[in-house]
Design a protein with these regions (language model features):
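Bacterial Sec-dependent N-terminal signal peptides
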Residues: 1-22
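N-terminal "domain-start" segment that seeds a small globular fold
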Residues: 19-35
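Thiol-based oxidoreductase modules, predominantly thioredoxin-like and allied folds used
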Residues: 23-26, 69-97
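Short active-site neighborhood of thiol/selenol oxidoreductases, capturing the structured segment around
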Residues: 40-53
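Structural recognition of the beta-strand scaffold that forms the well-ordered cores
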Residues: 44-47, 77-81, 113-116, 123-126
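C-type cytochrome heme c attachment motif
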Residues: 51-58, 112-115
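Typically the conserved alpha-helix immediately C-terminal to a functionally engaged Cys/Sec
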Residues: 56-73
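Non-catalytic, surface beta->alpha helical segment in thiol-disulfide oxidoreductase systems
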Residues: 102-162
Length: 175
């Protein structure tokens, strides 16, 4: 009897520990996001990123800045899908994410590449400007203006909130 109990306990802990390393698939991430967005009356802000991507980290840092974090949280369900990982970090990629990225981007695009969906999975907009260039993590005045315009069209953000976002994202050193 003790042997059976020990075996069950070991199996439980091995399963639990293995489960901690499980990376959700693109479908799992997106289905959870769509359901949450539907329930909360929000849109989905998807960012494709990678562990090595400095611009991705900058985008995250800006979106989570205390001055504007609530603006994003109140209007979007924000999710990430990892792609373009190095050979030794391929295990960090979400299964299905690279193909999803390829289906959404137009032409060549680096990361971060972001797409805004409604709660039904319809694309509302993405990080490509009118010239099909990826603004990714916007820093210049023009990039931030495009970003803020997209946010205005896909959220309930008011002009004051959009102004705060502009101040957080615009890095005058790049203009």
């Amino acid at each position: 009897m003790n042997r059976i109990i020990k075996t069950i306990i070991i199996c439980f802990f091995v399963g639990f520990l293995n489960g901690q390393d499980t990376i959700l698939s693109k479908d799992e991430v997106m289905n959870i996001a769509y359901a949450e967005a539907e329930q909360e009356g929000k849109n989905v802000f998807l960012m494709f990123d990678a562990s090595w991507c400095g611009w991705c980290k900058r985008m995250d840092k800006n979106m989570n800045n205390n001055a504007c974090k609530n603006f994003f949280d109140d209007n979007y369900v924000t999710v990430h899908l990892a792609i373009k990982e190095s050979k030794e970090n391929k295990h960090l990629e979400n299964p299905g994410a690279p193909d999803f990225y390829d289906s959404l981007k137009e032409g060549t695009s680096g990361i971060p590449f972001w797409v805004i969906f409604d709660s039904k999975g319809n694309v509302l907009d993405n990080s490509l400007d009118s010239n099909n260039n990826n603004i990714g993590s916007p820093v210049t005045r023009d990039e931030v203006q495009v970003f803020v315009s997209i946010l205005k069209d896909t959220s309930k953000l008011n002009d004051k909130e959009l102004s705060v976002i502009t101040e957080v994202f615009w890095d005058k050193a790049y203009d």
